[in-house]
């Protein structure tokens, strides 16, 4: 939740809520859950964007330019101004990481509240708002990596990174969107995937495995149904295979892919937030 609700959130919410309502009507015990990606690179980029916009309020845009890879939206400026209204310039000379963390802590709950408010306008409510960061804080990510290591699904590379034998487990579930290398004969070979980088930081895939392990093993759901954007189609077989790798049944995870759309006006795409 690095910004206001967009069309993908809205369409995914409607699709998931309709499916949940049908299953509920059919007699299933359904829990509606929203997964909050509040860890990883996107949140770090969110914090960096906020911090730069905050510093610009006091030093100017020329002194503190916003890189192109940062979030450029007006909502980022608005959140930075809200922070400044409370704290003034007291963070201008603080360590950049401290400033970034403070802004994330201030802005993220507001964005989540905004999502909840907007979803409520078309009568969608979730029973659980699950934070990705909790998986890291609780040690759940480390636990699932240990399970994979113990089962031989992972190994430690020469540089210290922990690698996962993805293709070995994903192949039974269909086409895998994976990185490839060319071997000596010029043919493509599937590469194993990084779960923990050489610097000790887990990848997003490690957290995803821990999250689905939490649903199926820790909380004991009989079936997990995810709503994903179609651009993540290559991740389906990987995640199902990962459930097998940790000793669960990958067929208990269903993924509904939601196609992406562009809204047009006068022949031009319309940007909606």
What do the predicted segments below correspond to?
Residues 1-273:
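NTP-dependent nucleotidyl-transfer catalytic core
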């Amino acid at each position: 939740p690095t910004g206001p609700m967009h069309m993908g959130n809205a369409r995914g919410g409607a699709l998931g809520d309709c499916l949940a309502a049908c299953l509920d009507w059919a007699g299933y015990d359904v829990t509606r859950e929203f997964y909050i990606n509040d860890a990883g690179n996107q949140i770090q980029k969110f914090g960096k964007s906020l911090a730069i916009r905050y510093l610009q309020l006091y030093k100017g845009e020329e002194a503190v330019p916003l890189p192109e890879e940062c979030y450029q939206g007006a909502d980022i400026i608005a959140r930075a101004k809200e922070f400044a209204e409370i704290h003034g310039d007291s963070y201008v000379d603080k360590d950049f990481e401290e400033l970034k963390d403070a802004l994330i802590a201030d802005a993220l709950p507001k964005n989540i509240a905004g999502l909840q408010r907007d979803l409520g306008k078309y009568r969608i409510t979730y029973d659980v708002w699950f934070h990705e960061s909790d998986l890291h804080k609780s040690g759940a990510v480390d636990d699932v990596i240990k399970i994979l290591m113990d089962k031989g699904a992972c190994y430690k590379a020469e540089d210290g990174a922990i690698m996962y034998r993805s293709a070995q487990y994903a192949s039974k579930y269909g086409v895998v969107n994976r990185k490839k290398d060319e071997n000596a004969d010029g043919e493509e070979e599937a590469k194993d995937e990084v779960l923990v980088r050489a610097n000790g930081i887990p990848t997003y895939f490690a957290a995803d495995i821990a999250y689905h392990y939490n649903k199926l093993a820790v909380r004991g759901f009989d079936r997990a149904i995810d709503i994903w954007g179609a651009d993540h189609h290559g991740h389906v077989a990987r995640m199902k295979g990962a459930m097998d790798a940790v000793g669960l049944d990958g067929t208990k995870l269903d993924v509904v892919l939601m196609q992406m759309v562009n809204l047009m006006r006068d022949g031009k795409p319309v940007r909606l937030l």
